[in-house]
């Protein structure tokens, strides 16, 4: 019988998963396979991106010190995926989106394993399972300066959404109130405490308006507004093409057709291994159960964790 794996961190959102890395990787790879199956059945386009793309080219699989899988999806396909998920049963998998759950603090979607439990941040407690990140890829302005301005506008909305989604302690509220420079944040968080759901809907509508400003099919440039690489998230749509397949563990996955231009744009010499001290897992994990789904109420009953 396989030993149960339940891990928790009482003070921070950092959790070492080295001892369970093999099982972790196998689980997220299975999630990717399920996602690929959905895309094949509905003729949806996606590309592996970021560290996952480097992993495919340099390691032919998950980077040994990486701990997630990321894909980008053209906006028309992404919007179709959101609709498909509402009417289709994916068995042990589910699509988690910011439109369906007020407790979900992010602004892109994840395909998640219902048979596992993961809380990434105690400040923004949301129960999901192990996952693959799905980032929408939006058309943007042909002029790169205007594309930057749009990125800045979008980021401001993201920052407001982050503020609304973060749960502060009473002491933290008092600290904000005591500092006149923080009164603006105090006002936002107080309003969010009472009106979180309508404020979230309004912010998401603002983000969607920016995302749909341009016709994807006619666009010269595309942009991952929800990505974490700043202005590098804008690049020529022509780089994507029909995709180029690479071995990734025991499957093949698509990368942008001009994958070398794409990866050098983001990472420079991506074939060069980073220094040893930078080969670390970077994602948040406050609570993890690899064996079953728990509710937030169940997790809070554990005496040694406060979420």
Identify the meaning behind each predicted range.
Residues 151-155:
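Short, His- and charge-rich active-site/binding loops that engage polyanionic ligands
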Residues 143-149:
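A short secondary-structure junction signal
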Residues 1-2, 15:
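Accessible peptide chain termini
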Residues 12, 16-40, 82-142, 160-268, ...:
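Conserved catalytic core of two-metal-ion nucleotidyltransferases
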Residues 36-69, 73, 78-79, 238, ...:
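Active-site nucleotide-donor binding segment shared across nucleotidyl transfer reactions
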């Amino acid at each position: 019988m396989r030993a149960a794996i339940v891990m928790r961190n009482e003070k921070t959102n950092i959790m070492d998963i080295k001892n369970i890395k093999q099982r972790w990787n196998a689980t997220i790879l299975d999630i990717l396979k399920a996602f690929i199956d959905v895309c094949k059945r509905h003729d949806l386009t996606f590309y592996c991106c970021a560290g996952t793309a480097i992993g495919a080219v340099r390691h032919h699989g998950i980077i040994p010190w990486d701990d997630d899988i990321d894909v980008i999806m053209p906006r028309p396909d992404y919007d179709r995926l959101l609709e498909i998920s509402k009417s289709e049963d994916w068995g042990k998998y589910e699509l988690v989106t910011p439109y369906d759950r007020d407790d979900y603090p992010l602004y892109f979607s994840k395909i998640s394993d219902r048979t596992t439990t993961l809380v990434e941040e105690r400040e923004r407690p949301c129960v999901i399972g192990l996952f693959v990140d799905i980032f929408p890829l939006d058309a943007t302005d042909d002029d790169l300066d205007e594309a930057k301005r749009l990125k800045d506008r979008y980021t401001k909305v993201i920052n407001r959404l982050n503020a609304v989604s973060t749960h502060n302690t009473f002491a933290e509220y008092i600290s904000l109130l005591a500092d006149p420079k923080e009164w603006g944040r105090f006002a936002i968080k107080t309003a969010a405490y009472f009106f979180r759901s309508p404020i979230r809907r309004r912010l998401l509508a603002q983000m969607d308006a920016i995302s749909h400003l341009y016709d994807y099919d006619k666009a010269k440039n595309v942009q991952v507004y929800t990505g974490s690489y700043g202005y590098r998230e804008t690049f020529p749509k022509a780089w994507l093409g029909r995709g180029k397949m690479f071995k990734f563990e025991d499957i093949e996955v698509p990368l942008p057709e001009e994958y070398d231009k794409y990866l050098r744009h983001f990472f420079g010499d991506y074939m060069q291994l980073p220094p040893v001290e930078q080969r670390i897992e970077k994602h948040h994990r406050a609570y993890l159960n690899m064996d079953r789904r728990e509710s937030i109420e169940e997790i809070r009953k554990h005496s040694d964790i406060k979420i």
